[in-house]
A protein has these predicted regions:
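A short hydrophobic beta-strand segment most commonly corresponding to one strand
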Residues: 81, 95-115
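Short, conserved beta-strand element in jelly-roll/cupin
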Residues: 35-39, 48-65, 103-106
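A short, N-terminal "cap"/entry segment at the start of jelly-roll beta-barrel domains
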Residues: 1-30, 112-129
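Conserved strand-loop elements at the edges of beta-sheets that form or border functional pockets
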Residues: 24, 48, 56, 76, ...
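Conserved short histidine dyad/triad with adjacent acidic residue
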Residues: 18-21, 32-49, 84
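Short beta-strand His + acidic residue motifs that chelate non-heme Fe in jelly-roll/DSBH
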Residues: 44-46, 64-65, 73, 87-94
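Short acidic-glycine-tyrosine-enriched beta hairpin
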Residues: 68-85
Length: 129
């Protein structure tokens, strides 16, 4: 099926973010994969996934943070593996575009991403480790 590129919803993202669906698995697969492009400074809100999430940096420079851990920088080829139900955010560096392939699964009960508050400028602006 054709899945067009769309703007990410502002309730769950800060800044301009475009989502380009790559894969929605057919049962029994619950895999979803989306290319996500963030403009400089754009990022997700805090969120978590019931089965975790894997991010593969494709281009530009990005950031990712799991709650309670330092901000990490992502460059093309880098992979971030987010554990199940770990609150986290990810997005572009302040002065760079960033695209990653985001891969996750829904839980067996069908539940997916749980969204929380937007990431503060203070949390976002922390120097990467």
């Amino acid at each position: 099926a054709d899945r067009p590129t769309k703007a990410a919803p502002p309730d769950n993202f800060t800044g301009h973010v475009m989502q380009d669906p790559v894969l929605v698995g057919e049962a029994p697969s619950r895999m979803r994969a989306t290319n996500v492009t963030f403009t400089p400074g754009a990022r997700t809100a805090w969120h978590q996934h019931p089965v975790g999430q894997t991010l593969l940096a494709v281009s530009g420079v990005g950031r990712v943070q799991v709650e309670g851990e330092p901000v990490q920088e992502l460059r093309p080829g880098d992979t971030a593996i987010i554990p199940p139900n770990a609150r986290h955010w990810h997005g572009a560096a302040p002065d760079r575009l960033f695209t990653h392939l985001a891969m996750s699964e829904t839980a067996e009960d069908g539940s997916g991403t749980e969204w929380f508050e937007h990431v503060s400028d203070g949390d976002y602006g922390a120097e990467p480790a």
